[in-house]
Amino acid sequence: MSTPYLLIDAGNSRVKWALVQADGTQTHSGAFSHGGQLVKGTGDPLQSRHEPDWSALPAPGSAWLSNVAGDAVARRIDAFIDRHWPGLARTTVRSAAQQCGVTNAYTTPSQLGSDRWAGMIGARAAFPGEPLLIATFGTATTLEALTADGVFVGGLIAPGWSLMMRSLGEHTAQLPTLDSTAARGLLDGDNAAGQREPAERGAWFATDTPRSLSSGCALAQIGLIERMWRHLQDEWQVSVRLVVGGGAAGELVQALSVPYTRHDSLVLAGLALIAAQAPVYPSTHTRPV
């Protein structure tokens, strides 16, 4: 068996990771929070109760990272890797003008988030030769339009579902601040008192403020996705596959009225392809991609 790659996708709320063989076979994977859930006395967001135990894993030959969470999280991830595999060669992926069959149409290609770039590479490999609209429901909701021949023509960024709800709570005098945990039950059809809403009112019309917030912010997300999907269908005059993923996808896709495909590991899949196609360098702590 070949030496695996360690792949790390550090988003704004969670870190997802996987060990992957050179042929793309995933042998181990997991996710943990990098903020808010601290072990008492550590003061380190990576020292959470959800920190993975890598002690029994086979040693990887290199690590490949997408990090959109900032320098502090990058340093903590480095320290965490070094606790298990000191000096492991690692590469922080950056967006490029062209890579792994995807062409970046951004005016300044390096401005594109590495997670979005790796996700498009993963999506193109998963659905080759298809025009795609990729929607990721995370802290931010992002959309990427990818042509059948792999050209990323552009995208959109909007506040995510949780961020939208939290912003309304923090910037208004009377609206509550909802988190995604509280809002999930409200989307299931219960009002704030835990009672089922009458079906004749319609699934999305609420009779209390918390559920109005949850449903309204969810439909703002869905309206954006469906409008842009229909726009691409009209503009390209072809069937466009809508690919959805992200931490809030489970709650939001129930409101979609258009066909979609769920894929929650596009970034890790893209990182695996980038790692497999990268030139081989002598072992170093960090190296170019």
UniProtKB/Swiss-Prot annotation:
The family database entries (InterPro entries) matched by this protein are listed as:
ATPase_NBD, Type_III_PanK
Q: List UniProt keywords, sorted A-Z.
A: ATP-binding, Coenzyme A biosynthesis, Cytoplasm, Kinase, Nucleotide-binding, Potassium, Transferase
Pathway given for this chain reads: Cofactor biosynthesis; coenzyme A biosynthesis; CoA from (R)-pantothenate: step 1/5
Gene Ontology molecular function terms on file:
ATP binding; pantothenate kinase activity
**Does this entry carry the keyword Nucleotide-binding?**
yes
**Catalytic reaction(s) noted:** (R)-pantothenate + ATP = (R)-4'-phosphopantothenate + ADP + H(+)
* Main location class: cytoplasm
User: Where is substrate bound in this sequence?
Assistant: 106, 113-116, 209
User: What is a biological process (GO) this protein takes part in?
Assistant: coenzyme A biosynthetic process
- Pfam families the UniProt entry points to: Pan_kinase (PF03309)
Q: Where does ATP bind?
A: 9-16, 139
* Alphabetical list of NCBIfam families matching this protein: baf, PRK13328.1-4
Spell out the HAMAP family in the cross-references: Pantothen_kinase_3
What protein family is recorded? Belongs to the type III pantothenate kinase family.
Q: What is this protein called?
A: Type III pantothenate kinase
The organism encoding this protein is: Paraburkholderia phymatum (strain DSM 17167 / CIP 108236 / LMG 21445 / STM815)
